[in-house]
Amino acid sequence: MRGSGTLRGVNEPAIRLTGLRKSFGALTAVDGVDLSIRPGEVVALLGPNGAGKSTTIDLALGLARPTAGSAELFGAAPRVAIREGRVGAMLQGGALLPTLTVAESVALVAAAHRNPLTVTEALERARCTEIARQRVSKLSGGQLQRARFAVAVVSDPDLLFLDEPTAAMDVEARRTFWRSMREFTEAGRTVVFATHYLDEADEHADRIVMMARGRIVADGTPAEVKAVVSGRRIRATARFAATPESQAALAALPGVRTADRRGDRVTLVSDDSDATLRALLAEHDIHDLHDIEVTVHTMDEAFLALTETRATEGALS
C-alpha cells in the first residue's frame, strides 16, 4: 500500500455517496443512498437479491451514471482514484480472457498500473499459486473467484470493492478466501463487500450497511444491527377461543411487539419474554396452553425483519 502521507484526499472519506439514486425506467434500483466510509473500515453491504447492492457498487466505481446524487472516492471522482491505482474491484460480471492463464491475466492487469505488486505477490495474496498456470477456461467456479481476487489486488489498492466474492465457493474455499482478506486488511486498507451470507457479514465486517429495495435500512456494527431485532419468540398451542378480544389481549401483554395466531398456534415476539410469559400464564389457565417454547431470533429472522419491515416503513415515511 502506498505511503498514506503522500496520498491525495488522505483526510477525506474513502467513499462518500450523497443522495445517490439510480432508476432504470420505472424501476428504482438505488433510492436516495447517503453513505460515508472512513479509510480502514471493512464494511459489508448486506441485503437480499435485488436490494441494490451491486448497483450501488457500480455507481461508486463510476461504472454507471446516477440518475441523481454523486459518488466520490478519496474526495475525487471515481475515475481519478481508479486511474491512480487506488481502487480494486472484484465484480460478479468481471470477465477474464478464457485463453490466458491465471498468471497471464494478473500480469496483463499489472501492466496497466504504475506501482503494482509483482505477479507472484498477487498470486500468493489470493492463494492462487497452485493454479497460476491453469487457463481461465479450465477453472472451477471457486478457482475463478480466487483468480478475480488476484486481479483485483495486483494494483495494491487502498480501497477494494468485492461483489459477492465467495459465490460459487465451497465452505473450505470461503475460509481460505477470508484468511487472504484478513491479511489484506491488516495494513489499514478499506474494503467494501456485498454479500447475502449473514455469517460472513457478522464475522468479517466492522460495520454492516443493510439494504432493501434500494434503500439503507440499517447501518452499524454487527452487534448494533442485530440489537435492532432483539427479543425472543414465544410459541404455544392454545385451547382458548380465537376471538378479536383474545387476540387484542395477546397483543397487549407486557413486552409483546407482535402477536399472531394461526389455528391453535400462537406466536408472540417479545422484548421481555419473562414478563410476557408471567402475564400470559396469569390470564389463562395452564390447561389452555400447551407445548410452550421460547426461542431467540435467528440471524435469518433478523435479516428478514430489517429488510422487509424497515424498507416498508421507509417507503411510507
Regions found by a protein language model. Give the residues of each.
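Conserved ABC transporter NBD signature motif
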Residues: 69-83
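Catalytic Walker B motif of ABC-type/P-loop ATPase nucleotide-binding domains
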Residues: 160-164
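Conserved catalytic motifs of ABC-family nucleotide-binding domains
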Residues: 156
